[in-house]
Structures are given as C-alpha cells and as structure tokens.
C-alpha cells in the first residue's frame, strides 16, 4: 500500500522501509500460526461457556473469533467463516486483517508505551490530532483525544456546562443514544439502559424528524421553544445525531438541522454533534460537514472507526485546566491505526458524493430495494447513508428482529438490530467491502423467510 510521504521527523519511524519490512515478516508469521490453530467443536463451546459464566450473562451471539479473516470475512476459533456486516459495532474500517493497518499497528506496538496519556503524549497523538483537524473546518480548532465514544461525549458535556454555568440542562432528541456512562445513560432515550440508575432530571427531550409528518420540523421547534421558555437561562446545550444509530438509522434533511440549530444559536445554547457512530460512514469524516452545517457546530465527537475517540471544539469551548484530563488519551496502536485509516480515506477515493463509501451505500440501497420488490412483506423500509444501512424485517416487532438476526448468524452473516416501533436490521460493513452487496442479495431472502 502506497504511503503518503513527507519530511517530518515525527513520521520517520512509520515511513522507514526496514521497519515496515520487519513488521510484514512478523505479521506473516503470526498469520501462518493462526491459520493452523483451530479449536475442536467441544473446546470451542467450552470456551464460550466459560466466558459467558465469567461475564455473568450470555454473549449476544455464541462466537469467538480467531484473529484471522479478510475484509468482511472473519474466521471463528472453530475454523468456520462468517461475513461480518457489523464490524465489531462499527470499528473495522477496512475489514479484518487489513495488511496495511496491521503493519501500522505492529510498528506502533513495538514502541515505548502501550497507551499514551495527556501527561506524556507521543508522536502518534500528534499525527492523529493533525489528521482529524484537516477535516473539521475553520471553527473547530482544538481536539482532545480519549478512549471510548462515551468518554468523548462526557468531555463535550463538561465543556458545555463549564462554558454556560450556571445552566444545568441539556436537550437531546427522542430515541437518541450517546453512551453508557452515568451521564450518557441519562442522555440516551432508552429506559432499559438506565434501569435502577438515579437521574438528575436535567435532560430534556424533543421529537426527531419524521419524514412522514409534514409538520415534523415545526413540532421539534415548538418543543424546543417550550423548553427554553420553561427554563430560561438554564439550558446549556443541545446534542444532535446526524443519523440516529441505535435509534434506527433515522436522519433528517439539512434544512431541518439548520432550523433547529438556528434556534439554539438565537437562545445562546451550544450545538454539540455526536458523531461517534457516523464518523466516516456517511462519505465524509464528519456528517455535519457533509450537510454543510459548520457555521453552527460548537463541539463534535468522534469514535468507533477512529480506533479511539475525540472531542473537537471551538476556541470558545476550550476548557479551563483541570476540567478534562485522565490517565489515558488512547492506545498507541489505536492512534497509529486511526491516523492510517484517515490517510487512506483521503488518498484512495473513499470520500465525497462520488467516493467509494457513497457508492457502496447506493449499491446496497439498490439491492435492498430490489429485494423489497421481490419480498414486499418480508423487507420493508430501507434506510441509510453510505456504510450505514438498515431495513425493516416484516413488521419490525422485537421477536421478528431477533429471529432474523439468529437466522442470519446461523447462515453465516453477522448483523445487529436498531430502533424500535418498528425495529430494523442494521449493517455497518467495512467501507472497502464488495461482499456486502452480493452476499446480502443471496442471503437475505433466506433469513427473512423465518
């Protein structure tokens, strides 16, 4: 894989041909060994059972991966192959065992530290921050790296509250998802995800866009205005998802977001965009930039495909010392691989309306719509953008979604559900895959006949 050359000494290690040759030799040796190691069916099931017992609950799917595979195809520890269209819930940019990313990972792993912190960052933190800021526009000038998307969102929330103190309320959309920490569980509109947790009562909800309702935008604006009227000076910010990931891949047109963001700005409310799941998958690194919403956004968060997470913010939201910190800024390997992912997206034609990600999304949409014509009762609404695609199976009832997911897994296809009323089957395929088109075309008629 051709690498971008530059003269910066900070890039000298990863660009060194002898180092890369050594990395490739190690990768080859590991993969040869991995391909020869297969658990017997009995040992495989025993390992799964032991892991489930230690976890205290079953795995969603009874599987253990082997560390081998290629692209969307992943090898289980018992030697069977499956097609992974969920990518570890959206973290595999170019699929499994991408040689170029493995090379970047091996070089980084041979360095001084497994993890990097905010006290002692390394060159990988510089390179990743620099790569991110190439895609954030003129207003978002700063980046703070972290481990998980939830932590990036926590940092965004703290920056907003500090800037707007003493305001203590945040507005979110119904059906949104923002993470599983205490604060993010309250922002997430899924009561089952916060069962038994104490709530602050400082999270306010507004309805998200409904394409079937011509008054949808007005309903959102009225709800937002009502909150602002009831709590004058108490609302610090509003969090947006450009596409509601866990909420069923629901999205909205640019004019909807503009109207809502304009009202936020008029009221002095921070605009925060949660792009943990949408990062890269819509055909640009940030979906808000694809929709040309730069002038309204104060803070954005990224994760998943980044191999870590980040909070990106304007100068106005630059926090005072002590507000955001922590032992870990991310893993050295994650930073190196995240940087390499961005470089390849830039260099290999993935970005833009005619880029490979957008073309992949359009191909999947065409195939899903073709299947919907053949099986109109089994495959309903097909939604998505780029490498985020979903469809409603049958009536979208929870038991139907569960049955389709189980049938898909047994047939060798890993998918996940999303949303409710109706539930959907979602796909987060590698952005480089071609399997996502051909295999779904052959397999979905079988699994949707459950």
Question: What does each of the following model-derived ranges do?
Answer:
Residues 2-442, 449:
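Conserved N-terminal phosphate-binding loop of PLP-dependent enzymes in the Aspartate aminotransferase
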């Amino acid at each position: 894989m051709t690498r971008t050359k530059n003269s910066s000494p900070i890039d000298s290690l990863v660009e060194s041909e002898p180092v890369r040759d050594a990395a490739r030799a190690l990768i080859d040796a590991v993969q040869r060994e991995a391909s020869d190691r297969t658990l017997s069916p009995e040992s495989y099931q025993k390992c799964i059972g032991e892991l489930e017992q230690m976890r205290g609950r079953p795995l969603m799917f009874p599987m253990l991966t082997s560390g081998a595979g290629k692209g969307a195809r992943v090898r289980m520890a018992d030697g069977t192959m499956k097609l992974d269209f969920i990518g570890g819930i959206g973290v595999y940019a170019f699929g499994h065992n991408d040689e170029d990313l493995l090379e970047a990972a091996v070089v980084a792993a041979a360095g001084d530290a497994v993890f990097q912190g905010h006290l002692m960052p390394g060159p990988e933190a510089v390179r990743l921050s620099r790569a991110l800021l190439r895609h954030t526009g003129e207003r978002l000038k700063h980046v703070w790296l972290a481990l998980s998307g939830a932590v990036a969102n926590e940092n965004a929330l703290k920056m907003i509250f500090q800037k707007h103190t003493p305001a203590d309320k945040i507005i979110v959309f119904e059906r949104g998802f923002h993470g599983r920490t205490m604060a993010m569980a309250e922002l997430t509109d899924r009561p089952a995800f916060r069962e038994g947790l104490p709530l602050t009562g400082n999270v306010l909800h507004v309805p998200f866009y409904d394409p079937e309702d011509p008054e949808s935008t007005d309903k959102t604006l009225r709800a937002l205005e009502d909150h602002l009227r009831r709590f004058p000076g108490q609302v610090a910010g509003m969090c947006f998802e450009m596409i509601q990931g866990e909420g069923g891949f629901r999205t909205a047109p640019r004019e909807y977001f503009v109207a809502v963001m304009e009202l936020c700005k008029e009221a002095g409310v921070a605009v925060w965009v949660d792009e943990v799941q949408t990062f890269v998958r819509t055909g640009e690194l940030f979906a808000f930039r694809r929709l040309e919403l730069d002038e309204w956004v104060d803070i954005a968060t990224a994760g998943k495909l980044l191999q870590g997470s980040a909070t990106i913010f304007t100068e106005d939201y630059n926090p005072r010392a002590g507000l955001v910190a922590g032992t870990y800024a991310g893993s050295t390997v994650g930073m190196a691989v995240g940087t390499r992912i961005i470089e390849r997206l830039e260099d290999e034609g993935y970005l833009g309306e005619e880029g490979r990600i957008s073309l992949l999304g359009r191909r999947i949409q065409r195939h899903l719509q073709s299947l919907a014509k053949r099986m109109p009762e089994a495959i309903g609404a097909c939604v998505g953008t780029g490498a985020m695609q979903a469809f409603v199976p049958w009536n979208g009832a929870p038991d139907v979604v569960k049955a389709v997911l189980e049938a898909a897994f047994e047939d060798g296809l890993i998918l996940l559900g999303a949303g409710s009323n109706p539930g959907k089957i979602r796909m987060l395929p590698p952005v480089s895959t071609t399997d996502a088109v051909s295999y779904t075309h052959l397999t979905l008629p079988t699994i949707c006949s459950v």
